[in-house]
Each structure stands twice: as structure tokens, then as C-alpha cells.
């Protein structure tokens, strides 16, 4: 009879131990950098965690499970980890579980890319975008009405059958208590990433990201920000992008999905800042740059190397809105004109811009003489306050009619169609799943 109390105690101990390991998972897991044969799994664990691993297997072959351990440091105040799984099979659905101290704390799945080149038509796919995710924190927010809105929009996004999410900057908002130290910046990333409303979304699909001023540092932060290198390290720790700039500078990178190449730009690390004058002595100011020479050289070469039908350039600030008095590429006139003139001279078809920042969504059409039009698809905000266009932007002649959305929303973007007529369809969707605006462009219409 003494066995029964012992068994009960053993069961209670086992449940308590498993619960403790669950608490050691702070946020995640999420995947990123999905490729044909590898993927990155990201998570954050508590300071009490001693060991982290990922166990994974093809869904149809659970007997072929493998494990990969995290070999980096643990036991710090914040412990984001990234584990790369290698030698996977292309076009395969995998199940995986995150193990903390040998206990399974969360399960999810990922699908490796299909090897379609020279074998089959480019696969159709859908992805989500969004920017400006402000999460309220009492005591550290601005006094008065909370700036952050309903964050249940992420629950709606979780239900989307999307292939990945592309975050377009201001993915969290640093506050005055965060700006002035590396630990402050790390706290903001850690705290906002760990919110319960985000966890299902993080695991639902792969994630890629760029930053803008508020997750880089203070409002309108530029290369003058003294913690820009520390901020870069935090961004690297919290996002599973494939790479982060070049020569240990910046966070720009590139990835591909089906027949689309994505060029993720860094508009902060190298930026002169919006407060530097556009002109000096009546001439465009050559010192004012948003991206810097090295990044622009990389972008030009990367675009020339691309054979993708759509070439998506993602950047935090609007690229083509010449009517905006806020952060926009045209306020950096020498760099802007140099790039736009280059685009006019070379034959690079299929360019589309994805941008955020503005606290409203819209599509800008930029017509060019003797060349195809450029489009700037702006999506904002996810949860921050909204802001309607003002001044010359109210009746902007370059805004595509029916695309202005001034409320919390995200983008659902589908690339589809036969190989000789690929299309990109954009929908702006609110937190209830209602479509508020639409836009579609054909790859065949993005040719010189």
C-alpha cells in the first residue's frame, strides 16, 4: 500500500518538474531562414535553463528523429538562442520540439523549400507584412491615452495560411528608459517578444525582419546613435535572418522564395538622419545619406544578379513618396537621385518596394518616362496609433485609388499565376480579418 503514495509523489514531482521547464521557455520557438536543406530555430529561455536542444523529424517518418543542441552561453539575464538544423530534405514537412533541460516545452512544424528550378513551375505562395508594433507597458509609456492598440491582430495573423512573415520595422518600440544603455535596449526586445499574444504567431510561420528607428533606438535615430552597434547585436540575437549586413556593419540581407527575391535594407545604421538638411547653399546635400555607399553598392550588384520575376526591396521608410514631409528616401536627394537614375539606365525588371513607418497603409505609383512604373506598398500600423496623411499627401496624385487604410492592419500578399503571367496581389487586412484595401500588379507590367 505504501507504493501508492510513492507513485503519487513521483507523478506530482514529474508534473512540477515539467511545469518548471515550461516556465524556462520565455518566448518562441519560431523559425527563419527557411531553405532547401536547412532552417534556423529561434527561442528565448530563462536564466535557469541549463540545456537547450531541438528534436526534429519528417512528419511521415517519426522514427528518423534527430537532435541539435545549442552550444552557446546560457545563464544570462536574457538568453535568446538560434539553432541551425542542417542536411534536411527539400520540400518536406518537418515536426519539431524544443527541449529545455531534456524536457519538451513546445512543439511546432516547418516546411523546407521546394526544389522547383528546372523541374516544375515556380510555386505560388503567400506572405504577410506589417510594421509599427507598439505594446503598452504601464509606468514606462507616455501619460494619457495608451498609444498601443488591440494586439489581438496577431491572433488573426496566426490563422493565416502564410508561408512567412516579413516585419517591416518598428517591430518593438524602445522608450526613454531603454535608450541610454545596452541593457535597456535588450530589455525592450526581451519584454515585448515574450508577450503571450505573440507566441502562437511566432510558431505559426517563419519570420524575417528589418528595423526602423524605434527598434533601432530613439525616434529618428541615425548613425549618430552611440549604441548602434549594441542595437545591431540585439537585433541579431532576436531575429533568425540569414545574415546581418557586411563587415560587421548594418543588418541588410537577402533571401528568396519561389520566383521572388527579397532585398532587406537597413535605413538606420548608416543613415545621416532626417534632421540633416536636404540641401546646403542651394544645392542637394551630398553628405545626407539614408543607406550609405557600401549598402547601395551591394544593392545595385544584388539586383543585377537577380533573375527573379519580382524583386522586392523592403525598407523601413517610404521609398517613392515625394509628397511626404516625413522620413522618405527623396529627402536624401543625392543618394535618391543616384539610385533612381541608375534604375532608369539599367534593365532591372520586376522591382517592387515594401515599406512601413507611416501609421497608415497605401500604395504609391511612381511613373517613369520610357520605363515601367515603380510601386511602393506601405503597410502600417500593426498595433501602434494610426495617423492619416496630411498636407500635400491628403489628395496625393501618386497614391493608387482605394488603397489608403488608416487603422490597424497587416498585408496579405500572394504571388501566383502561370509562369508567363505571374501576379502579386496585395490585401490590407484588419484585426478582424476584413479586407480594407486591394492592389494587384503583373510581372509582365514591370518591364522596360
Name each region found by the language model.
Residues 1-24:
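Bacterial Sec-dependent N-terminal signal peptides
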Residues 21-448:
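Metal-dependent phosphoester/phosphodiester hydrolase catalytic core
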Amino acid at each position: 500500500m505504501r507504493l501508492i503514495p510513492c507513485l503519487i509523489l513521483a507523478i506530482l514531482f514529474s508534473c512540477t518538474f515539467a511545469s518548471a521547464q515550461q516556465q524556462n521557455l520565455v518566448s518562441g520557438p519560431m523559425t527563419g531562414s527557411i531553405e532547401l536543406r536547412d532552417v534556423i530555430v529561434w527561442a528565448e529561455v530563462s536564466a535557469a535553463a541549463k540545456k537547450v536542444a531541438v528534436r526534429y523529424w519528417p512528419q511521415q517518418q517519426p522514427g528518423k528523429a534527430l537532435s541539435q543542441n545549442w552550444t552557446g552561453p546560457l545563464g544570462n539575464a536574457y538568453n535568446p538562442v538560434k539553432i541551425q538544423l542542417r542536411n534536411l530534405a527539400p520540400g518536406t514537412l518537418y515536426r519539431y520540439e524544443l527541449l529545455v533541460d531534456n524536457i519538451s516545452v513546445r512543439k511546432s512544424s516547418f516546411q523546407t523549400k521546394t526544389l522547383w528550378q528546372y523541374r516544375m513551375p515556380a510555386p505560388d505562395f503567400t506572405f504577410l507584412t506589417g510594421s509599427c508594433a507598439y505594446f503598452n507597458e504601464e509606468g514606462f509609456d507616455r501619460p494619457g491615452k495608451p498609444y498601443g492598440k488591440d494586439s489581438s491582430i496577431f491572433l488573426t495573423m496566426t490563422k493565416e495560411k502564410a508561408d512567412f512573415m516579413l516585419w517591416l520595422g518598428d517591430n518593438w518600440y524602445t522608450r526613454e528608459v531603454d535608450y541610454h544603455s545596452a541593457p535597456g535596449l535588450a530589455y525592450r526586445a526581451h519584454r515585448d517578444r515574450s508577450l503571450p499574444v505573440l507566441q502562437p504567431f511566432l510558431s505559426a510561420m517563419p519570420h524575417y525582419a528589418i528595423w526602423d528607428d524605434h527598434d533601432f533606438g530613439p525616434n529618428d535615430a541615425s548613425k549618430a546613435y552611440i549604441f548602434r552597434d549594441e542595437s545591431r547585436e540585439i537585433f541579431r540575437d532576436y531575429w533568425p535572418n540569414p545574415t546581418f549586413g557586411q563587415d560587421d556593419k548594418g543588418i541588410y540581407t537577402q533571401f528568396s522564395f519561389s520566383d521572388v527575391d527579397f532585398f532587406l535594407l537597413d535605413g538606420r545604421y548608416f543613415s545621416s538622419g532626417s534632421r540633416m538638411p536636404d540641401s546646403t547653399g542651394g544645392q542637394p546635400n551630398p553628405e545626407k545619406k539614408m543607406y550609405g555607399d557600401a549598402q547601395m553598392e551591394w544593392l545595385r550588384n544584388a539586383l543585377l544578379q537577380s533573375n527573379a520575376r519580382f524583386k522586392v526591396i523592403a525598407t523601413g521608410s517610404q521609398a517613392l513618396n515625394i509628397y511626404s514631409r516625413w522620413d522618405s528616401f527623396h529627402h536624401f536627394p543625392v543618394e535618391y537621385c543616384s539610385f533612381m537614375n541608375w534604375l532608369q539606365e539599367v534593365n532591372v525588371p520586376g522591382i517592387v518596394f515594401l515599406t512601413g513607418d507611416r501609421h497608415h497603409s497605401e500604395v504609391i505609383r511612381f511613373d517613369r518616362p520610357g520605363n515601367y512604373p515603380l510601386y511602393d506598398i506601405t503597410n502600417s500600423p500593426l498595433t501602434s496609433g494610426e495617423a492619416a496623411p496630411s498636407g500635400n499627401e491628403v489628395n496625393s496624385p501618386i497614391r493608387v485609388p482605394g488603397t489608403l487604410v488608416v487603422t490597424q492592419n497587416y498585408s496579405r500578399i500572394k504571388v501566383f499565376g502561370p509562369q508567363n503571367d505571374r501576379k502579386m496581389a496585395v490585401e490590407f487586412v484588419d484585426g478582424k480579418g476584413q479586407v480594407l484595401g486591394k492592389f494587384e500588379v503583373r510581372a509582365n507590367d514591370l518591364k522596360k
